[in-house]
């Protein structure tokens, strides 16, 4: 089952501010969107973590399915996949995502923003 996460925060990437996090599961017609305060990278991690928490608390919806998670954050995808350095301040968020991987088997891949349906997730 394909799942997508997305985050957007206006302004300078390393300056905390109000952003939007979202995820969607097109096959189940589920979308989620919420506000989150943090840097751009923290917002991107928050979107991934919100999706993984949803999967974790709804195991019957995903029973017997291969979970493919897609995000347009090159950094988050590659940090969680151990292919890119993760800054110290983001390591707790990365650790949470890796912790979910130990509970929920999922594949994490990058997708171009234009192909990410989570960017248009409805409230």
What are these regions (language model features)?
Residues 1-42, 46, 53-54:
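RNase H-like nuclease fold core
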Residues 8-14, 49-123:
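RNase H catalytic domain
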């Amino acid at each position: 089952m394909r799942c997508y996460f997305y985050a957007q925060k206006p302004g300078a990437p390393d300056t905390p501010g109000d952003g939007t996090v979202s995820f969607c599961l097109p096959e189940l017609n589920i979308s989620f969107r919420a506000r989150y305060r943090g840097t751009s990278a923290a917002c991107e991690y928050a979107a991934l973590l919100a999706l993984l928490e949803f999967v974790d608390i709804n195991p019957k919806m995903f029973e017997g399915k291969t979970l493919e998670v897609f995000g347009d954050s090159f950094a988050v995808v590659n940090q969680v996949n151990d292919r890119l350095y993760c800054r110290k301040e983001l390591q707790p968020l990365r650790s949470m995502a890796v912790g979910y991987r130990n509970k929920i088997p999922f594949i994490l891949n990058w997708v171009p923003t234009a192909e990410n349906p989570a960017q248009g997730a409805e409230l």
